[in-house]
């Protein structure tokens, strides 16, 4: 009797909801919030769980960026393609970063969250923000540009500086383009290494619920829900403004480019919850790059747009800066003319680039902006220090979504978006049908990346 061994494989049954990463992270956030609220000391003690997860992710970011960019650029084959992607990406970044600043400025003038507080600047404890102010003075646009160049090639990876790794990767990728066929063995080697590195990303993402649990328990335990109540108008205004920016502004951009912002958010829900839990958009950077490529964006575009966007396309941080600056002015009864507000916006445009990539960038950049615009008292930052931690989650999520949208849009502009695959993946029809991203000719089936994907 002949047995047919060529029959089509049986479709995999859908996994139970509790095995999806987004559900696990959501449960972890809720559990962390409860622990932090009812057992604050225990919540604070769980901080190492969140810190450890962030360190694990940062450990893998440099190789992910380097390998993605180098193999992507080598695949382009020409320097013209590199210049085209970079030009369109920075055009997008400048446009929407500026728009985010304007939205924050308009919202602050309309809602006026600081009006009626009547705070005397002299009564504020400026020592609380002294460290942030000193860091702001240390950072400058020139220093930022010089910091992009690493002391050595290896120091970029040792320090984990995203922009330095990006700089080295672009130079190396261009070098491979210029040597042509001689570079093919190197590209093949890096393709193989990237396969293993992205499998590591899958493994690390399985620890995401633990990291989110520890980080959120610490946040609630240390700062408490009560600290938000006193400045609820500011926090609420910021969350509302960020939501409107994502839905209206970014949503319109998505619509004009033929896709839905809500479907994109649904596709990235696990990563968004991870960003919420850890208050760090960086924690989801490797996973974002993987998912954008899986959705049909060309690797070369993903490799250039996502890492640079993390420094130059900070929509959430920009909304926060102008909104917080005007809140401080209103709370301290400091009247700003239209010209002064425009100056504030222009300074914020520059300082947001000069302080990119710095730990606590949002608060430091605000200090840098206020120090250049002396009309608004820097000491007023003490007013928002207690709730800044609760606004950082919203900043990070808005930054994250903004960079995801930028990647898809620039890919479409470049003709580097597989539209059929993109629609299928965002429509939830991908299942196991999408080919492995980092496929290797002849690689054993068990080595395929997406089989180990947490979500």
Swiss-Prot record:
Main location group: membrane
SUPFAM superfamilies in UniProt: Proton glutamate symport protein
GO-annotated molecular function: fumarate transmembrane transporter activity; malate:proton symporter activity; succinate transmembrane transporter activity
GO biological process, one term: L-aspartate transmembrane transport
Recorded topology in the membrane: Multi-pass membrane protein
Entry keyword set: Cell inner membrane, Cell membrane, Membrane, Plasmid, Symport, Transmembrane, Transmembrane helix, Transport
Cell compartments where the protein resides: Cell inner membrane
Superkingdom of origin: Bacteria
TM spans (from-to): 20-40, 59-79, 91-111, 160-180, 209-229, 231-251, 344-364, 367-387
NCBIfam families named among the record's database cross-references: PRK01663.1 (NF002461), PRK13027.1 (NF009587)
Family: Belongs to the dicarboxylate/amino acid:cation symporter (DAACS) (TC 2.A.23) family.
Name of this protein: C4-dicarboxylate transport protein
Organism (species): Paracoccus denitrificans (strain Pd 1222)
Gene symbol of the encoding locus: dctA
């Amino acid at each position: 009797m002949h047995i047919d061994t060529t029959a089509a494989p049986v479709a995999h049954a859908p996994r139970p909801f509790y095995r999806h990463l987004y559900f696990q992270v959501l449960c972890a956030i809720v559990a962390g919030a409860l622990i932090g609220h009812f057992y604050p000391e225990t919540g604070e003690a769980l901080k190492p769980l969140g810190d450890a997860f962030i360190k694990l992710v940062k450990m893998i970011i440099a190789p992910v960026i380097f390998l993605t960019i180098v193999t992507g650029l080598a695949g382009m084959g020409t320097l013209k393609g590199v210049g085209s992607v970079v030009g369109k990406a920075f055009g997008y970044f400048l446009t929407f970063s500026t728009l985010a600043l304007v939205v924050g400025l308009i919202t602050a003038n309309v809602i006026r969250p600081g009006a009626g507080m009547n705070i005397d600047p002299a009564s504020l404890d400026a020592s609380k923000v002294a460290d942030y102010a000193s860091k702001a003075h240390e950072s400058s646009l020139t220093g930022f540009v010089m910091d992009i160049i690493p002391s050595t090639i290896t120091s970029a990876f040792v320090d984990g500086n995203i922009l330095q790794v990006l700089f080295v990767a672009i130079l190396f990728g261009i070098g491979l383009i210029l040597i042509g066929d001689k570079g093919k063995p190197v590209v093949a080697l890096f393709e193989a290494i990237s396969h293993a590195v992205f499998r590591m990303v899958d493994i690390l993402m399985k620890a995401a619920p633990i990291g989110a649990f520890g980080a959120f328990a610490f946040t609630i335990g240390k700062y408490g829900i009560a600290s938000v109540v006193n400045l609820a108008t500011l926090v609420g205004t910021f969350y509302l403004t960020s939501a409107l920016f994502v839905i209206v502004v970014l949503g319109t951009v998505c619509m004009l480019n033929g896709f839905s912002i809500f479907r994109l958010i649904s596709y990235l829900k696990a990563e968004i919850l991870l960003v919420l839990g850890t208050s760090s958009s960086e924690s989801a950077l490797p996973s974002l790059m993987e998912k954008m490529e899986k959705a049909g964006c060309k690797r070369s575009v993903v490799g250039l747009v996502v890492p640079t966007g993390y420094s130059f396309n900070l929509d959430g941080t920009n909304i926060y800066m102008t909104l917080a600056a005007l809140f401080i002015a209103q709370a301290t009864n400091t009247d700003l003319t239209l010209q002064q507000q425009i100056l504030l916006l222009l300074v914020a445009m520059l300082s947001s680039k000069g302080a990119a990539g710095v730990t606590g960038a949002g608060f430091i950049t605000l200090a840098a902006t206020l120090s250049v615009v002396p009309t608004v008292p820097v000491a007023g930052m003490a007013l928002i220090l207690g709730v800044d931690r609760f606004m950082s989650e919203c900043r990070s999520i808005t930054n994250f979504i903004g960079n995801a949208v930028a990647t898809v849009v620039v890919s479409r502009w470049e003709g580097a978006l597989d539209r059929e695959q993109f629609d299928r993946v965002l429509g939830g029809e991908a299942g196991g049908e999408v080919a492995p991203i980092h496929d290797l000719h002849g690689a054993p089936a068990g080595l395929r990346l997406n089989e180990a994907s947490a979500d």
